[in-house]
From Swiss-Prot:
Lineage: Bacteria, Pseudomonadati, Pseudomonadota, Betaproteobacteria, Burkholderiales
Designated name of the protein: CRISPR-associated endoribonuclease Cas2
Cofactor: Mg(2+)
GO biological process: defense response to virus; maintenance of CRISPR repeat elements
EC number(s) recorded for this UniProt protein: 3.1.-.-
Length: 102
């Protein structure tokens, strides 16, 4: 399961830029990867983890702007098509031989 966060935050004033930076750092520290500008995604273990991370997002929302969340299954996420550009390093497929178990 994946949780995708889409946001559009104002960056007009110094306080706006600070709120943007604080929210973006929260996402990165909470395990989200940037998919593209203002779109971040995170792998989840199931609906319990989705609820937990939704609560964490709600607790760290900026006061202004627009923030949206979409939770999709791994199969739905894998069916996403990249139309222009190259896949990010995090998006490259890993086969069973490349996985190391400790």
């Amino acid at each position: 399961m994946r949780m995708l966060v889409f946001f559009d935050l104002p960056v007009v004033s110094k306080a706006d830029r600070r709120a943007y930076t604080v929210f973006r750092r929260f996402l990165l520290n909470d395990g989200y990867d940037m998919i593209q500008f203002s779109v971040y995604g995170r792998i989840l273990n199931g609906t319990d983890a989705a609820q937990k991370h939704m609560q964490r997002l709600l607790a760290n929302l900026p006061s202004e702007g627009s923030v949206r969340v979409l939770t999709v299954t791994e199969k739905q996420f894998a069916s996403m098509k990249l139309l222009v550009g190259l896949p990010l390093f995090q998006e490259k497929k890993v086969n069973a031989a490349q996985i190391a178990l400790f």
